[in-house]
Swiss-Prot record:
Entry GO MF terms: acetylglutamate kinase activity; ATP binding
Protein name, as recorded: Acetylglutamate kinase
Function: Catalyzes the ATP-dependent phosphorylation of N-acetyl-L-glutamate.
Biological processes per GO annotation: arginine biosynthetic process via ornithine; L-arginine biosynthetic process
Originating gene: argB
Organism: Escherichia coli O139:H28 (strain E24377A / ETEC)
Record field: catalytic activity: N-acetyl-L-glutamate + ATP = N-acetyl-L-glutamyl 5-phosphate + ADP
């Protein structure tokens, strides 16, 4: 069975209640299903808190965080350090054997600089599946942060949705993007069950899909096209629905290729 990549984002990393719900659902799922799981995470809220504490400005361009050279070490520490190890601690608490990684480990995801104006922000491309497949075969849960490294040895901050997409392509995995919201909402706040590229374009033009959600939708569309299968955007808030979601039941917005 294809591995399943669960991309975590939003304020989930900031909420003990949410993490408890998520890891309880993961334990339940792993007990009754053989499907290998991989977690990919960002940690924007962890970074924002740290930047605020250090009085450093947070700038975004087209929904992507601008990462100057003097901030990449701080962001790496927040994502590959604090956020990653927090998730490993929760896995340990729930007796899940997990391994913390970043995109460069085992060359799992190749990263190049996306745009000089964004600074240390990386473009993620599929890499080698060997390391993660080896971990999955031995029963481990890989927990992968969205920090990458270029062939020149430059650390890069990668949008976590795009990192998860590249890793899904690497592993031939299915992908779920877990978010704060129950999916993509229309202008009246109602969840849209299915989304095509044409529909997304229309909603972006109408200003209904904005900011970070544009990046999320484009990443999901890119993933659906790359993987040749649908990708789900759903909420982590309803823990009781997560095992069914992990099993392929649509619970949020299903992005069609």
């Amino acid at each position: 069975m294809n591995p399943l990549i669960i991309k975590l984002g939003g304020v989930l990393l900031d909420s003990e209640e949410a993490l408890e719900r998520l890891f309880s659902a993961l334990v339940n799922y792993r007990e009754s299903h053989q499907r290998p799981l991989v977690i990919v995470h960002g940690g924007g809220c962890v970074v924002d808190e740290l930047m605020k504490g250090l009085n450093l400005p947070v700038k975004k361009k087209n929904g992507l965080r601008v990462t100057p050279a003097d901030q990449i070490d701080i962001i790496t520490g927040a994502l590959a350090g604090t956020a990653n190890k927090t998730l490993l601690a929760w896995a340990k608490k729930h007796q899940i054997a997990a391994v913390g990684l970043f995109l460069g480990d085992g060359d799992s995801v190749k990263v190049t600089q996306l745009d000089e104006e964004l600074g240390h922000v990386g473009l993620a491309q599929p890499g080698s599946p060997k390391l993660i497949n080896s971990l999955l075969e031995n029963g481990y849960l890989p927990v992968v942060s969205s920090i990458g490294v270029t062939d020149e040895g430059q650390l890069m901050n990668v949008n976590a949705d795009q990192a998860a997409t590249a890793l899904a392509a690497t592993l031939g995995a299915d992908l779920i993007l877990l978010s704060d919201v129950s999916g993509i909402l229309d202008g009246k706040g109602q969840r849209i069950a299915e989304m095509t590229a044409a529909k997304a374009e229309q909603l972006i033009e109408q200003g209904i899909i904005t900011d970070g959600m544009i990046v999320k939708v484009n990443a999901a569309l890119d993933a659906a096209r790359t993987l040749g299968r649908p990708v789900d955007i759903a909420s982590w808030r309803h823990a009781e629905q997560l095992p069914a979601l992990f099993n392929g039941m649509p619970m949020g917005t299903r992005i069609l290729a």
